[in-house]
Amino acid sequence: MPGSSQGQSPLSVERNREFFARDVYGHNADRLDSHVRIRAAVTAELAGTGRLLDVGNGGVFEYDPAVAEQVLACDLFLDESMSPEYPDNVTIARGDALDLHEELGTHDVVLEAFLYHHLTGRRASDSVDNIRRAIGQAKGRLEPGGRLVVVESCIPAALYPLERALYPPLQLLARTRLLGGHPATLQLPIALLRRLIAEQLTIEKSVRIPLGRWVTQFGRPFPAALTPVRAHLIVARKAS
């Protein structure tokens, strides 16, 4: 999901804004079997949360908001005026994953779900810098001993060089109708993502979420058996 601006290219920001405003992803997340499994896994992980900061929410809850006493969901195109559309324990706010303005050290859990592959810049190499910054921003909002919960789609390490090489033409395609309005994205191998998180937090859990028959690929339903992309859940803790 979208959620940053400083390290993202203007095209990435605008395409993310337009895509998620149309709620294409949210429609698929509500009905595809893989997303049902992901929602169950994330809901279980968040059970008993007090104050949850959901960064890059995109207007889509990858969990049952009732599991937390308070939820603050932020993204670039969300606005506080939208809060009445959601459960009473949910507050909606405009927010940037790379430049959060929420108070430091005030949340026991920060969730960043399917955010990182959207944090693309003009070059493929910008993604790593953006993700590292997003993790740092999330860490700052955690109280001592708080947890960062990451849900992310990752590719096999062997395909990462190819994906990076294909990123420039993918950016060009994102300017056309061929991607259906979906922004150019770039997924990391799970080992690289774990390494970026471990630079700043202590990883306590890293598991693959089993997929069903269908996933979303560039926002469209796609057979899971035909894509190398897999969903991972990582839980990391800030020092007490």
Question: What kind of feature is each model-predicted range?
Answer:
Residues V128-P144:
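A short glycine-rich, Lys/Arg-flanked "PGG" loop and its adjoining helix->strand segment in the class I
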Residues L111, L115:
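A conserved beta-strand element that flanks and buttresses the S-adenosyl-L-methionine
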Residues P2-E45:
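Class I SAM-dependent methyltransferase Rossmann-like catalytic core
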Residues R51, G145-L148:
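Short glycine-centered segments of the SAM/dcSAM-binding site in methyltransferase folds
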Residues L53-L100:
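Class I SAM-dependent methyltransferase SAM/SAH-binding core
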Residues L98-V110:
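A short acidic, Gly/Pro-enriched loop at the edge of an enzyme's catalytic core
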Residues V151-T216:
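C-terminal alpha-helical "lid/dimerization" subdomain adjacent to the S-adenosyl-L-methionine
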Residues Q200-T202, T216-S240:
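Core SAM-dependent methyltransferase catalytic element
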